[in-house]
Amino acid sequence: MFKLPSDRVFIIAELSANHNGSLEVALETVKAAKRAGADAIKLQTYTADTITLKCDQPDFKIEGGTLWDGRYLHDLYLEAFTPWEWHEQIFKAASDEGLVCFSSPFDPSAVDFLEGLGCPLYKIASFEITDIPLIEYAASKAKPMILSTGIAKKIDIERAVDACLRQGNKDLTLLKCTSSYPAPIEEANLRLMVQFKDDFPVSVGLSDHTPGHLVPVIATTL
């Protein structure tokens, strides 16, 4: 069974929607991640219909100074998702490069699909940290769990960690995250990584959205 290393930094490259709808770009990104020195590459596993509703009401329109202001959620996710039929090829390409490949599932059907691919660990996205049924289901697979905390209050983190522990899953990592794209360096607040280690029985890391490399380099010292 896969275990995250405890004696060194483990670098994860994010594929997410960076393929721009092209499988060729996705596969080239895997190779680029290897050349850049990453240990792993992460996907996101959802469809527009499993993550949101096709609705033009205000609550489904993106606002607030983001890169996607004015877009409706369903339209954006339909454009950004990684087709599930690509996953097997991406997992194989990563394996061929010596990279660990895993994903963020956004609903139980995604967990089931990823189990069929032998996904070695799961990462819960910041905006899913309050989805306790999803966390419990992923944790029940007895694989390492990485939880991002970008929008979480302490009580949300406590509940998510407890959800994993209830499933007997103690292989947990909490990531400090600022849910902005890009995230201002002055909002990095890396001291929370130390606080996480004090408050929870977990390993810690950083989900970095800042420009440049200053913040992740500093994070490796904590």
Please report, for each region that a protein language model flagged, where it lies by residue.
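Catalytic cores and adjacent flexible loops of soluble metabolic enzymes
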Residues: 1-222
